[in-house]
Design a protein with these regions (language model features):
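Short loop segments and helix-boundary regions at transmembrane helix junctions
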Residues: 15-24, 118-126, 147-214, 218, ...
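Transmembrane helix-bundle core of multi-pass membrane transporters
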Residues: 76, 81, 186, 190-255, ...
């Protein structure tokens, strides 16, 4: 029998390849997150707490109540996010998945913008501000101008991109010209945008007449994103725009010369500078493009879903986009999947609340998923995946 060659010794086994893959890590991250969330569901459930007071007398009541609480909570999450099999019609049943995709659309677009900065080594925290100014610009063009249908929609979307790009470009200029920390500048720009929006909604140019709450007029029908599946579903053309934006991110960062420069600056700014790449110019362009994409997300949100501007138009999209971009490893496919996941937890959380589960628990589930996915070594150790990556002991090593 021939002795094992070095090539055979270095060839990883199937188990080792599984252990090194990211897919099992993501799966186990969800498993651990939902297991810990199940414990929190039990603690928050009144029936479980009551049955626990006589656990040793009638343990079956406790286990039955625990099972019912967990199953009903996650069943409600599934029905609220994916498919409501208890609905009377198929339209109502599938509307939950369509609603999840609708909620995910602006979130994914904003996360794609965040990913541009992350891939280039810039930590953009200004998603909220860029989203707000993009929404405001698109809304103003939508209700303030009278244009032909297609031109009106394109103009409103372009205004959102331009405004978001301008807002991100301010931070990029400060970074390029004065080496100002982008984390600090984008956070400050967030607060400026929030207060700017609050002021705009008090002006005659933005505030709708005869309304009690600060709100703009509704955008005109010619500027609204058309719905893709009829009036019974809210999914609109923004979903297609989101897919095109993901394709643009892939092309920009993987196939274009500009994207290569961005990645080079992100990997090693000094080496990029020596190679003749202007780090300052790259930083400015990165923030310009990132802000434009986030502004597009704001425009899609106001033109496709909200149809009017209010002081809560950004919601938590700006900060959730940071998490989605990190969760998706700043890649187009990963961001789309992570965005749908976050949107599903949001839409399904409303159903969970009807089962007596606190709505804040949904945020806890999101945080747990992010926590575990952001720490692959922890997940591998907890799940035993790290044992699969240990090198094999060959026959020669055993004899030695």
């Amino acid at each position: 029998v021939s002795a094992p060659t070095a090539e055979n010794e270095n060839t990883p086994t199937l188990a080792a390849r599984i252990g090194r893959s990211e897919i099992p890590v993501v799966i186990m991250a969800f498993v651990f997150a939902f297991l810990i969330s199940a414990v929190l569901i039990l603690i928050s459930n009144e029936d479980v707490r009551q049955s626990a007071t006589y656990l040793f007398a009638r343990p079956s009541d406790f286990f039955r109540a625990s099972w019912d609480a967990i199953v009903s909570a996650y069943d409600a999450l599934f029905r609220g996010a994916v498919y409501d099999y208890r609905a009377r019609t198929s339209t109502q049943a599938w509307n939950r998945l369509i609603e999840t995709l609708t909620v995910a659309t602006p979130l994914i677009i904003a996360a794609l913008g965040m990913a541009v900065g992350f891939r280039a080594g810039l930590f953009n925290i200004g998603g909220t501000g860029q989203l707000i100014v993009g929404s405001a610009a698109a809304a103003w063009v939508g209700f303030g101008l009278s244009l032909p249908p297609v031109i009106h929609l394109i103009a409103a979307l372009a205004a959102g991109i331009a405004a978001g790009g301008l807002w991100g470009g301010i931070a990029g200029f400060l970074k390029a010209r004065f080496d100002a920390n982008e984390v600090i500048t984008t956070i400050m720009l967030n607060w400026i945008a929030v207060n700017l929006l609050a002021w705009l909604l008090t002006t005659a140019a933005f505030r709708a007449p005869n309304v009690l709450t600060p709100q703009s007029p509704q955008v005109k029908a010619t500027a609204m994103l058309p719905r893709l599946l009829g009036d019974q579903f809210r999914l609109h053309l923004g979903f297609v725009i989101m897919l095109l934006a993901a394709l643009f991110l892939w092309w920009l960062m993987s196939r274009s010369t500009l994207g290569f420069r961005f990645r080079a600056v992100g990997e090693n700014p000094r080496a990029a500078q020596v190679a003749g790449i202007s780090v300052g110019t790259s930083s400015f362009l990165v923030m310009l493009i990132a802000g434009g994409l986030v502004g597009l997300g704001g425009a899609v949100n106001v033109l496709g879903t909200e149809h009017s501007l209010n002081d809560g138009i950004a919601g938590s999209i700006g900060f959730d986009a940071i998490t989605v971009a990190l969760l998706g490893r700043s890649g187009p496919v990963g961001i789309i999947l992570a965005g749908i996941l976050f949107a599903g937890l949001s839409t399904g959380g409303r159903y969970m609340e009807g089962q007596g589960v606190p709505i804040d628990l949904v945020a806890v589930i999101q945080a747990l998923v992010v926590l575990f996915i952001a720490a692959p070594p922890l997940v591998r150790r907890m799940s035993g995946l790290n044992l699969l990556t240990r090198p094999r002991r060959t026959a020669a090593a055993k004899e030695a």
